[in-house]
A protein has these predicted regions:
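Glycan-recognition and catalytic cores of secretory/periplasmic carbohydrate-active enzymes
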Residues: 1-149
């Protein structure tokens, strides 16, 4: 990956979604191949995403890097449009990687935003449910939970 993630063909733009979907793809590769290099790389990139996009005071990812000065405000995207939002995808990724402490903080923050933006956050709702099921010790993956016989 040449040590840097880019948005599309741009060498300068990058968003949390770029990280979130790459991490998701690496998690899927690990699930299919059981090759730990994919899981290790997903954890490394997740840590980078936490450093670049995660706002500690709000326990949520902002859309653009924290250090960028190209906009007048720090956008936080929690709504789904044509693709799931980056915060919901990162919550799913953190759970899949076993980064439960980070996932718990993000889950609680997204849960607070739900009261304001319920209609725009279907992926966040599914991500929070997924986190809560795994956190409770259930055997789940991104397709759902298995019932014990």
């Amino acid at each position: 990956i040449n040590d840097k993630i880019y948005h599309s063909y741009s060498k300068e733009l990058v968003f949390i979604e770029d990280y979130a979907f790459l991490i998701n793809a690496l998690n899927d590769l690990y699930d299919k191949t059981m090759n730990f290099k994919y899981k290790d790389l997903a954890k490394k990139i997740s840590s980078e995403a936490l450093n670049i996009f995660y706002i500690q005071e709000k326990n949520i990812f902002q859309k653009n890097p924290k250090g960028s000065n190209d906009v007048f405000f720090n956008p936080i995207d929690i709504g789904d449009n044509t693709i799931p939002n980056g915060n919901a995808m990162m919550l799913i990724n953190l759970v899949r990687l076993g980064m439960i402490k980070e996932a718990k903080k993000l889950s609680e923050s997204l849960n607070g935003y739900l009261n304001i933006y319920k209609n725009h956050m279907m992926t966040s709702l599914r991500a929070i449910d997924y986190f809560n099921e795994v956190y409770a010790g259930k055997n789940c993956n991104e397709e759902g939970c298995k019932l014990d016989d």
